[in-house]
UniProtKB/Swiss-Prot annotation:
NCBIfam families: PRK02749.1. This is Photosystem I reaction center subunit IV. It holds the Pfam family PSI_PsaE. GO terms for cellular component: photosystem I reaction center; plasma membrane-derived thylakoid membrane. It is found in: Cellular thylakoid membrane. It is a peripheral membrane protein. GO terms for biological process: photosynthesis.
Length: 69
């Protein structure tokens, strides 16, 4: 399962805010780190600063936690 930059992927990490959501791979690190895929999503998570709109729309995942959409 070779995931590369620009691929649309579905998140399979159950504890993730974006579980079963589809995102676009922003980058893939090949240096051997565990969570080597940066995935960008359309919606933001709940981690915005109090009183402001917004939050994070990217997260790192291992390739084993993703499947191509």
């Amino acid at each position: 399962m070779a995931i590369s930059r620009g691929d649309l992927v579905r998140v399979k990490r159950p504890e993730s805010y974006w579980y079963n959501e589809i995102g676009k791979v922003a980058s893939v690190d090949t240096t051997g780190i565990k969570y080597n895929c940066v995935v960008r999503f359309e919606k933001v998570n709940y981690a915005g600063i109090s009183g402001t709109e917004g939050g994070a729309n990217t997260n790192n995942f291992a390739e084993s936690e993703l499947e191509k959409a």
